[in-house]
C-alpha cells in the first residue's frame, strides 16, 4: 500500500440458496429452471477491502451479531502494521454500545473507525465486491446446496485480487 496509512472499507453480505439472477438468456419457448431450497440458511461474509484489492474476509455460517463483528475487528486490529482507517455504514450492530466500547482499544492499535453518512452505500466500496460476487461471479452450480455455495464463495474470496479483481477509479 502507498502513503502513511491504509484505507479499508468494511461491510457484511448475506448469501443464501435463492440465486441473485438479474437476467438470463434462453431460446424462445424453452424454460430455465434454477433449483432453490426451502431452507433459508445463510452464509454471511464480513470483510475489509482496500482500493488495491486487498481483502480480509470472515465467512460465517448462520446469523451474525455485534459479538461476531467485534471479533472480526479484534482480529483485524491485531494484524495491521500501520495506521488504518476503516469506513463502515451505520448498521445497528456496528453502532451498538457494545461495539463502540471497543473503539478506544482499536484506536490504540492504530485502527480508526469512520462512519459513512447514513443511506450512502455507494460510498462503501466493498458493496461493489458483494454485487460482483452475487450477480457476476457466483456460478449457477453454487446454488445446488449450501455446501456448494460455501465452496464457491470461499473460492472467490481466496482468488480475489488475482483471478477476481475490481478496477476502482482513482479520482
Task: Identify the function of each model-found stretch.
Residues 1-171:
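Short functional hotspots at interaction and active-site rims
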